[in-house]
């Protein structure tokens, strides 16, 4: 039996670090962000729907969607954010299910669905167990500002657009505290995976 694991966390909590550690173990990790990027590429149904919804102002000169422009629109407008999610989420969900089912058919021991907005999108039913990657509020803010070159105000706004990390950790089967060293994070992950093997 394949154990389907949901991997989630707050923005800039280090979820990608944990996902890469799982990949190094030879575990299939299905990344919702990568699938979401592919879903809005030219020629995909969601691409056309986004232009119909948001207009051609959000396009770059080569016709690709300007992620920064679209991001700025949806992070400050709840209705626009919901409209975008209504277009992108169904396409992403279907592709994730296809890939999950493929891993199950291949009798893999584990398959991981890496979904940043697992709880917000109410996708818990797609997985058997949930790991939340957590970090202190101070570290989260610092990492996000540095990684995305954001002002403190912009970073706080992005963090607030998601479910609070404390709420996510309360709903997890396991929590990895990623406030320390990589070795400490890896040790926690190894313990979890060994207990589920």
Swiss-Prot record:
Tagged with keyword Electron transport: no
Known pathway: Cofactor biosynthesis; coenzyme A biosynthesis; CoA from (R)-pantothenate: step 5/5
E.C. number(s) listed in UniProt: 2.7.1.24
Protein's job: Catalyzes the phosphorylation of the 3'-hydroxyl group of dephosphocoenzyme A to form coenzyme A.
GO CC annotation: cytoplasm
Binding site for ATP: 12-17
Gene3D superfamilies from the UniProt entry: P-loop containing nucleotide triphosphate hydrolases
Family matches, as HAMAP family: Dephospho_CoA_kinase
Family matches, as SUPFAM superfamilies: P-loop containing nucleoside triphosphate hydrolases
Species lineage: Bacteria, Bacillati, Bacillota, Bacilli, Bacillales
Keywords, ordered alphabetically: ATP-binding, Coenzyme A biosynthesis, Cytoplasm, Kinase, Nucleotide-binding, Transferase
The protein's name: Dephospho-CoA kinase
């Amino acid at each position: 039996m394949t154990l389907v694991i949901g991997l989630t966390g707050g923005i800039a909590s280090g979820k990608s670090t944990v996902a890469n550690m799982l990949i190094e173990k030879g575990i299939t990790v299905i990344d919702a962000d990568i699938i979401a990027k592919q879903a809005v590429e030219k020629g995909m149904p969601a691409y056309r729907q986004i232009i119909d919804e948001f207009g051609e102002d959000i396009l770059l000169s080569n016709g690709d969607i300007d992620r920064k422009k679209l991001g700025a629109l949806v992070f400050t407008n709840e209705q626009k954010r919901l409209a975008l999610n209504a277009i992108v989420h169904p396409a992403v969900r279907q592709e994730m299910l296809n890939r999950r089912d493929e891993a199950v058919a291949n009798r893999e021991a584990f398959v991981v669905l890496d979904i940043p907005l697992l709880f917000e999108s109410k996708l818990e039913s797609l997985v058997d167990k949930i790991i939340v990657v957590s970090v202190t509020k101070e570290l989260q803010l610092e990492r996000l500002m540095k990684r995305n070159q954001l002002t403190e105000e912009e970073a706080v706004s992005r963090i607030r657009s998601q479910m609070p990390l404390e709420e996510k950790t309360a709903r997890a089967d396991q929590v990895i505290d990623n406030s320390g060293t990589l070795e400490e994070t890896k040790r926690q992950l190894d313990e979890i995976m060994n207990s589920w093997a």
